[in-house]
Amino acid sequence: MNMTALETLKEFWGYDSFRPKQEDIVNSALEWKDVLAILPTGGGKSVCFQVPAMMREGIAIVVTPLIALMKDQVQNLNDRGIRALCVNAGMGRREVDLTLNNAAYGDFKFLYVSPERLGTSLFRQYVREMNVSFIVVDEAHCISQWGYDFRPDYLQIGKLRELVDAPVIALTATATPQVAEDIMERLGFKERCLIKTGFERPNLSYIVRMCEDKLGQLLNICSSVKGTGIV
């Protein structure tokens, strides 16, 4: 597509401007760089890979461990007129085969997959036929043995890079400097490109209350708050 990143953002998402650091991440990806983005939850990580993927030919492979999020994002993209697919653990072999066939030979922009899928022979067979624009790694801290949520299946992404000549966009909301270095090494970054924002959330306030009856205090707070919340 012959649109700028900002024009693409406006066309498909309706936003007039990027959030802090989003445009830096998008531009780095468009320059064919491997990039690790550390953004807080709610920081707009999806836009950071969806915009550049819409500006490049081919299909972006999005690796995510969260099936519910996978389905929500595919539905959201389809609602915007962007063709997207997903392969998850709840699908039978025939449905998986059909989905991967469509990803390889159809006109789709995004394929969401779980990390467990990457090592299967069927996936590896079809991925060789795909014109892959980007490899997107969501929850990228899961690839690091130094991270709090290490998942061995994420190590398959390194093998995927042997089959696909495409830059990596890795995203996480949490990574220490040690974990960030480990992520970039395990994903085979050609150059270190780390972009991160601060984690201050101006829409949140913090209150510390000293009390003896913690349960009673909690019940009082819950009874005074209307709507939903997290305890």
Regions found by a protein language model. Name each.
Residues 71-105, 182, 186-187:
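Conserved helix-turn-beta segment of the N-terminal RecA-like "Helicase ATP-binding" lobe
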Residues 32-51, 61-64:
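Walker A/P-loop
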Residues 31-37, 58-59, 107-109, 166, ...:
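Pre-Walker A (Motif I) flank of P-loop NTPase domains
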Residues 205-231:
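Conserved interdomain hinge at the start of the Helicase C-terminal
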Residues 60-70, 224-231:
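Conserved strand-helix element at the start of the C-terminal RecA-like helicase core
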Residues 1-40:
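Conserved pre-motif I regulatory segment
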Residues 128-137, 141-197, 215, 219:
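Post-DEXD/H (motif II) to motif III coupling segment of the RecA-like Helicase ATP-binding lobe
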Residues 43, 50, 91-134, 143-148:
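Conserved helix/coil segment N-terminal to the catalytic DExD/H
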